[in-house]
Amino acid sequence: GIVLPSGLMLAYPNLRQEFNGDKMEWRYDKSTREIDRVYGAKVFQGTVQALARCVIGEAMVRIHNVYPLGLTLHDAVYLTVKDYQADEALKFVETEMCRAPVWLPEIILGVEGHIGKSLKEV
């Protein structure tokens, strides 16, 4: 497997080389009892998605310590706050979402934040 800077491990159970016709491929056992192949772009995509999950997961904990999370969706967090808290909450969320984790201090993160009365407005 691949150990990320956060300590999370990307596992490829029973990783092995197998012939597919006349070419050699890397294959692993998926959790659904299927066999899948591994190639560079798949490893890269999985690594990026896992790193993003770690970064946003840590940010969500920090945000939740101050404001209750209403909803998360992929790389977005949604809060329900009083109107008078909206600007302050948005600034706080943007700050926390851009904070680099201690295990990857050189990463540069960006964020877009919006205020609305409904999900449709945001």
Report each predicted region and the residues it spans:
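Conserved catalytic core of nucleotide polymerization and phosphodiester-bond processing enzymes
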Residues: 1-122
